[in-house]
Regions:
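Sec-dependent bacterial lipoprotein signal peptides
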Residues: 1-14
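Sec-type signal peptide cleavage vicinity
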Residues: 13-329
Length: 329
């Protein structure tokens, strides 16, 4: 009897051990792994940029949300080397293709489903580059099977993360009326520029479900001292079908108002249609001079925001003069 009990115990132990080894083997074999990049030319992984022309990449503690088919979104966190989850995600099979939908950031966004992802709020920006990543929103998607890359889902190359919103850069020259001025307020006006947006992977577009916010304002209180200064804004833009001509965009024009102080006098200068139309996924750059109370565009460009884009840049030519109404208070 003693021998029988010992044999039975050994068999149970062996079975349990075999089951654990099988589970570990399956876990190792069928676990989903993630690799994510921003743009085709990026070799790193955050949204980390010194300026708008630098390479963008992910940094430590950044997080993304990833849907597998119609499952709920899973949070993946970048540890500086790789992407990890609190709980492993497994492939449902080895041979069938599955679609992965990813968005950044997971924090600051809320995803009820892949058709209704609440994007970061845009109405608390201060116009500086340093915190611009808090307001950005990027997406990526890819359809593949386990056998495509031994379980790895690489959001890179043609499948890399892309910017969904528009980046507006306004560079104010430290000359003319602004040489020794203090910029008190900058106001942007347009259709739904900072209204809360919701992204859908089904339509690959943003929907606005709230009353459009027509005005956005910052109060930099910036002293020029003959130096140029740039302000950055992430805003809602019109759909981008590959044609980055802003004249093709409707209902996303931007009016600019600058309130400033010079020699103890308060001025307001305005430029209607600074941009005739903002495009999703594009950077709109405008260099301006305030001269004799007029906002004059001295140059700029419109280009794709995502690194490695194949869109041709549009150069904005400078103007001789732009008659506007200038008010002194």
């Amino acid at each position: 009897r003693s021998l029988y009990v010992s044999l039975l115990t050994f068999m149970c132990f062996s079975a349990c051990q075999g089951s654990e080894e099988l589970e570990q083997s399956q876990e190792k074999e069928y676990t989903v792994s993630i690799m994510a990049r921003i743009g085709k030319t990026v070799s790193g992984a955050r949204y980390l940029q010194d300026h708008e022309n630098a390479i963008a990449s992910f940094s430590k503690t950044d997080d993304i949300g990833v849907f597998m088919d119609n499952d709920s979104a899973v949070r993946w966190i970048f540890d500086g080397t790789s992407w990890t989850t609190e709980k492993s995600v497994f492939w449902k099979d080895k041979n069938q293709e599955h679609t992965f939908y990813a968005y950044y950031p997971h924090s600051g966004s809320k995803a009820e489903s892949k058709e209704n992802i609440k994007m970061p709020s845009l109405d608390s920006q201060n116009g500086t580059w340093e915190n611009i990543d808090q307001y950005d929103f990027l997406v990526a998607s890819r359809k593949l099977s386990y056998d495509t890359d031994l379980g790895n889902v690489a959001f890179s190359g043609d499948y890399s993360f892309k910017h969904v919103l528009s980046l507006l850069k306004i560079n104010i020259k430290g000359e003319g009326d602004m040489a020794q001025a203090v910029i008190d307020k900058i106001r942007l006006e347009g259709n739904g520029l900072t209204t809360q947006g919701y992204y859908s992977f089904e339509t690959n577009s943003i929907t606005i479900s709230e009353t459009p916010k027509e005005t956005f304002q910052i109060t930099p209180s910036h002293t020029m001292n003959n130096q140029d200064v740039s302000f950055y804004f992430i805003l809602n833009g019109g759909e981008n079908d590959g044609n980055i001509d802003p004249k093709a965009v409707k209902n996303h024009s931007v009016n600019l108002t600058i309130e400033y102080t010079r020699n103890n006098k308060y001025y307001i200068t305005r430029r209607d249609d600074l941009s005739p139309g903002l495009l999703s996924g594009c950077i709109h750059k405008y260099n301006i001079v305030v001269k004799d109370g007029n906002v004059i565009i001295t140059g700029g460009s419109i280009s794709g925001w995502t690194p490695g884009n194949e869109e041709e840049d549009i150069v904005i030519n400078g103007e001789e003069i732009n008659p506007q109404t200038n008010n002194m208070l």
